[in-house]
Amino acid sequence: MQKWIVEDWEFIIKVIEGEAKHCRLGFEKGDVFTCQYEVPTGFCPKTMATVHTLCEIVRCGGSFKLRGSDKEYEIDFPCADGCIYFHLVARPINQ
C-alpha cells in the first residue's frame, strides 16, 4: 500500500476513566492511542465510529466547541458501551 496523502492532523486518544474489568478489550485509565487517519492499533471498533466522526469535524475546519467542549481541539466522550471515558486531542501537523 502506498499512502499518497500527507495528513494535517494527529489525534491522541487517552482513557481518562474506567476499569479494565468493565471493558471487553481491557482498557483502563492511562491507556493512550495515537493516530492520523488510520484506526489506532488495538482500539475498540465500536467506539471508532464516534472517533472518526470527531476527527472529521476537525479535518473539515470545525471545532469541538460546537459539540459542547470548552476547548476548540479537545473533547471528552464515552465509549460505545458507556463504560470507558476518553479524552481526544486534535493536534495540527505538517501545516
Q: What do these predicted ranges mean?
A:
Residues 13-23:
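N-terminal first-folded block
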Residues 45-62:
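Short, compositionally biased
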Residues 62-95:
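Short, compact, well-ordered microdomains
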Residues 2-14:
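Short, basic/aromatic beta-hairpin or loop at an interaction surface
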